[in-house]
Amino acid sequence: MIKVGIVGGTGYTGVELLRLLAQHPQAEVAVITSRSEAGVAVADMYPNLRGHYDGLAFSVPDSKALGACDVVFFATPHGVAHALAGELLAAGTKVIDLSADFRLQDATEWGKWYGQPHGAPELLKDAVYGLPEVNREKIRQARLIAVPGCYPTATQLGFLPLLEAGLADPSRLIADCKSGVSGAGRGAAVGSLFCEAGESMKAYAVKGHRHLPEISQGLRLAAGKDIGLTFVPHLTPMIRGIHATLYANVVDTSVDLQALFEKRYADEPFVDVMPAGSHPETRSVRGANVCRIAVHRPQGGDLVVVLSVIDNLVKGASGQAVQNLNILFGLDERMGLSHAGLLP
């Protein structure tokens, strides 16, 4: 049994991680931390987990207790893993970080987007970007895994086949993305209130979103050259979900794009390339660790439209973290993640 610790279990990604691990046959949560909720039983905080964690309570972070775990997940705001990851790695504990702390390879770039100096630049050389569809073999050997963000997951998986094949003009990529309100986190904020977010949709961070450098980094590696990306996120009145509408100009219109995407993801357990002409819906992946993709070429021209949907809390966060856990410990990649999407 894999002994698991979780730092920061009171946010949406934390409780989703608890939900998924409760059904994992090879993982046992031994430690879960929260300074604000120390002493509170997990089952009291989250009634949906009654019967799964009845003996587990939140505790103040303790390096010794966390260091005794085989793996520690960080479901925390940025900056927290900087302070604790090094000590855990020195103790031989694996780290899977759901925050943005180790996603960018450039510490200076990270500081520019997150408004503070990188707290552990010496660890960046050890960090593996945890997108299994790209870095599976590196994940197997990793000590420190940086779980991709929600927008970056949906966007990269949608663009990858085109860029890897050299088909897309990398200088003219557009990602028009929509997110559910849970993507903003569980903290109290006016913009997340029901009366503010309900029955409305808006774009935000058009000037530049923190996920932009992460997406650009991944697409640049896929293309093998510099890329030009316009990324516009939107807030929509739903709880869960990411819908990415992606645009690229292709340099060869004779290629069968449906076949290209199907071949690229044929062996990927959590990427579903839908039949030609499909329009994937966010509700089809709610609660599931799946990215559903459809590729279109309207009017038969050189403009390609890729539709990519995920649950931002599952394939966009906690589910992908568990997928990384399975790969890291040599388990079946699908273990604990074979949930169908919730309908209605």
UniProtKB/Swiss-Prot annotation:
One of its GO terms (molecular function) is NAD binding. It is found in: Cytoplasm. CDD domains: AGPR_1_C, AGPR_1_N. Keywords: Amino-acid biosynthesis, Arginine biosynthesis, Cytoplasm, NADP, Oxidoreductase. InterPro entries: AGPR_AS, AGPR_type-1, NAD(P)-bd_dom_sf, NAGSA_dehydrogenase, Semialdehyde_DH_NAD-bd. The active site is at C150. Pathway: Amino-acid biosynthesis; L-arginine biosynthesis; N(2)-acetyl-L-ornithine from L-glutamate: step 3/4. Catalyzes the NADPH-dependent reduction of N-acetyl-5-glutamyl phosphate to yield N-acetyl-L-glutamate 5-semialdehyde. Belongs to the NAGSA dehydrogenase family. Type 1 subfamily. This is N-acetyl-gamma-glutamyl-phosphate reductase 1.
